[in-house]
Amino acid sequence: MLQIYNTLSKTKEVFTPLVGNQVRMYVCGMTVYDYCHLGHGRSMVAFDVITRWLRHRGYDLTYVRNITDIDDKIINRANENDEPFDVLTERMIAAMHEDEARLNILKPDQEPRATDHIAGMHAMIQTLIDKGYAYAPGNGDVYYRVGKFAGYGKLSRRRVEDLRIGARIEPGEAKEDPLDFVLWKGAKPGEPSWSSPWGEGRPGWHIECSVMSTCCLGDSFDIHGGGNDLEFPHHENEIAQSEAATGKPYAKSWLHCGMITINGEKMSKSLGNFFTIREVLEKYHPEVVRYLLIASHYRSPINYSEENLREAKAALDRFYNALKGLPEAAPAEAAEYVERFAAAMDDDFNTAGACSVLFELAREVNRLRESDLSAAAALAARLKQLAGLLGVLQLEPEAFLQAGAEGKVDAAEVEALIQARLEARAAKNWAESDRIRDQLTAMGVVLEDGKGGTTWRLAD
């Protein structure tokens, strides 16, 4: 029985789809003005694991994740680069897809772009105006009338009265109320714009997601996700817009993943304390980064540090060493392990608990390989199958154990040195054998001499 924590109700609930076995999920994606940082990677990986588990449980899932390809940040960066905004966004979208592929993230079923849904935004905004939830003051802008929506604040548990304290209308804004937010922005010189019933302009951020989600999934759908920094105001405003426009409940369940922190602060571009996924992958294998992101529960914050990445590498080394050198086999039934893994994942996608079960499996594989190689191989196959539901442990063990972060060690050179060492040992030239081992150690290579010969891996 799958249970998920719903930010809307602030409780863990038994998950029941709105329609039969169909699950429709929308997740807020990237604003594509720069390379993805590790905080974006956290959300990508979290909802990738959720996608994998929902499908494993037999749900007919439609997963939609949008791309925000018009925004103040995009315009500013394009101006800084002296390039058209769409040239910038195309480059960043391609880079995002490359990062995702390296982190073994499955593609969403649909990836709508904001600029492809301008007409739908016009239609929803006009509906809101017709219903009295929005107004056009005549300066090219259109605002949402927050005070008219009775349910405002129900997601974030904020009270309108409290929000008004200290709120003010900025110069140039034509709001009726400081809390009102923009749906359509009148055109400014030098900015991209689209024609509309209210003049040239471009959409506000919040209306983009309301339109893309309902266009792809319908007025009401099962799951809306994103980082917990989006809960307010973005997701709160989405609810206000969508439910006012359609007259129906918007998303049934809201899932929010925790942030990546550095010294207790959220990793973000605005704070300047971020590392791009690409920068981290220059030092660490992609699977190490993915494991770091799944080793904690998706709602918990993750503190970024070199120590935590080294621990993730060490954990994967233990797993792959357990899988190494075993023959192919059909997965063992391993009912107890399978049931406990499923129980963890059914408990609000508790990947930390699921990883604990995988460690127990790995220990049992290591115990069995000394006495019953076929049983060890079958259990290892089950370990690999379960880990695959988290998107890890799918490489050949030797390939992972011998892989640097971007090929920092030349495998051919290592193999040649190992062969030279074997020849030195055969000739009883122990001094040369020790010299070669010391050279390999200095390269970060660990040798393991066994009955089947010498294997190697990179040091933790």
Swiss-Prot record:
InterPro entries: Cys-tRNA-ligase, Cys-tRNA-synt_Ia_DALR, Cys-tRNA/MSH_ligase, CysS_C, Rossmann-like_a/b/a_fold, tRNA-synt_1_cat_dom, tRNAsynth_Ia_anticodon-bd. GO terms for molecular function: ATP binding; cysteine-tRNA ligase activity; zinc ion binding. A motif ('HIGH' region) lies at residues 30-40. Gene3D superfamilies: Cysteine-tRNA ligase, C-terminal anti-codon recognition domain, HUPs. It catalyses: tRNA(Cys) + L-cysteine + ATP = L-cysteinyl-tRNA(Cys) + AMP + diphosphate. Keywords: Aminoacyl-tRNA synthetase, ATP-binding, Cytoplasm, Ligase, Metal-binding, Nucleotide-binding, Protein biosynthesis, Zinc. Zn(2+) binds at residues 28, 209, 234, 238. Binds 1 zinc ion per subunit. Its cofactor is Zn(2+). ATP binds at residue 269. A motif ('KMSKS' region) lies at residues 266-270. It is found in: Cytoplasm. Its EC number is 6.1.1.16. Signal peptide: none annotated. The keyword Plastid does not apply. Its main location: cytoplasm. Pfam families: CysS_C, DALR_2, tRNA-synt_1e. GO terms for biological process: cysteinyl-tRNA aminoacylation. Monomer. Belongs to the class-I aminoacyl-tRNA synthetase family. This is Cysteine--tRNA ligase.
